A protein has these predicted regions:
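Alpha/beta-hydrolase fold catalytic core
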Residues: 1-65, 91, 309-311
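Conserved alpha/beta-hydrolase catalytic His-Asp/Glu region
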Residues: 23-30, 170-178, 188-249
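Active-site loop/oxyanion-hole signature of alpha/beta-hydrolase fold enzymes
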Residues: 49, 56-58, 95-136
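Conserved HGGG/HGGXW glycine-rich cap/lid loop of the alpha/beta-hydrolase fold
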Residues: 57-103
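Flexible "cap/lid" loop of the alpha/beta hydrolase fold
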Residues: 150-151, 157-190
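Short beta-strand/loop motif that positions the catalytic acidic residue
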Residues: 250, 256-258
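Acidic catalytic loop of the alpha/beta-hydrolase fold
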Residues: 261-265
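Catalytic active-site module of serine/aspartate enzymes centered on a nucleophile-bearing elbow/loop
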Residues: 280, 287-311
């Protein structure tokens, strides 16, 4: 009997080790699907004009308010389910892959300026048929969400800006200092060696990743390298669109959430933003980097839930 018990314990461990080593894509996809399931979100596609968009949706329910999630540069809709799972089933949850990201179409002949991305996001939201919604955007997605709330306010009930882009912060973040010094963009990977550098910049507490999972993550990221290089040029220099000019035009309630240790977009951005907003709520998460929804999913969800329910 003792041998049987040992075998029952050892065999699943051995099986997982083999799968992890020889089928990391399966492990990666299984983890992603588990997060979606925990959040009650299912994958969908929708054709809007000439482009196909992928999105996650927990399902229409007229008795629940809707939250629209907008991811950042080089990211995707699946950055959100871990956080969304802590929202307790009180909302309809819709996370959209922006054009050029995730499983949505990836054209190279369009503009990826924030204003262009905002207009495309609006068309997707209209096509899905959302009557009104709360919006949360991270990084580049926060820049998009802020501009959306300022320019297309009719259906926006509130907006949460999560470590958002679009602000010329008083203190320059480490990533921008590095790029100014000639180092490569830490958000764009060129080899598996860049994975550790990526997480050093994005998180305080790095996720555990086996060598095979790390290699698979790098493979997925490197496949997007050329497109990400192209998109990034629309977010800087002459293409930069200053969100500070939009903030005074936001009429919906605004919440700002930032990781205290963000190395991509500095927390001092709040010093610029707060005077331009009325009655904004500010949450600074200690020991947190650029991706609070992944590094601190429960705390980020609780801040969002508390904010929405206070309105």
């Amino acid at each position: 009997m003792k041998k049987i018990i040992v075998a029952l314990i050892f065999i699943p461990i051995l099986a997982f080790a083999c799968i992890n080593q020889f089928a990391p894509a399966w492990v990666y996809d299984a983890a992603m699907q588990a997060a979606r399931t925990a959040a009650g979100m299912q994958a969908h596609n929708i054709q809007v004009g000439e482009y196909n968009y992928a999105y996650l949706d927990s399902g229409e329910d007229e008795n629940k308010p809707t939250i629209v999630f907008v991811h950042g540069f080089g990211a995707e809709k699946d950055n959100w389910p871990r956080m969304a799972a802590f929202l307790g089933g009180d909302y309809r949850l819709v996370a959209i892959d922006l054009l050029g990201h995730g499983e949505s179409d990836k054209p190279r002949n369009v503009s990826y300026k924030i204003s262009a991305q905002m207009q495309r996001l609006h068309r997707v939201i209209e096509a899905i048929g959302l009557p009104s919604f709360h919006m949360i955007g991270s990084s580049m997605g926060g820049h998009i969400a802020g501009m959306y709330a300022a320019r297309l306010p009719a259906k926006v009930l509130s907006v949460t800006l999560l470590s958002n882009g679009g602000i010329l912060s008083p203190v320059i973040a480490d990533a921008w200092k590095a790029m100014a010094g000639g180092e490569p963009n830490p958000l764009i990977m060129h080899s598996v060696d860049d994975v550790d550098r990526f997480f050093d910049y994005v998180m305080v507490e790095k996720p555990f990743m086996t060598a095979s999972i790390k290699a698979h993550f790098a493979k997925l990221s490197m496949a997007k390298r050329e497109l990400n290089d192209y998109i990034f040029e629309f977010l800087r220099d002459d293409n930069f669109e200053n969100l500070a000019l939009e903030l005074p035009n936001i009429s919906a309630p605004v919440q700002i959430i930032w990781g205290e240790n963000d190395r991509i977009l500095h927390v001092s951005s709040i010093q610029v933003m707060a005077p331009l907003l009325d009655n904004e709520k500010v949450v600074i998460l200690p020991n947190t980097g650029h991706g609070p929804m992944m590094e601190r999913p429960q705390q980020t969800a609780e801040a969002l839930d508390s904010f929405i329910k206070s309105l």
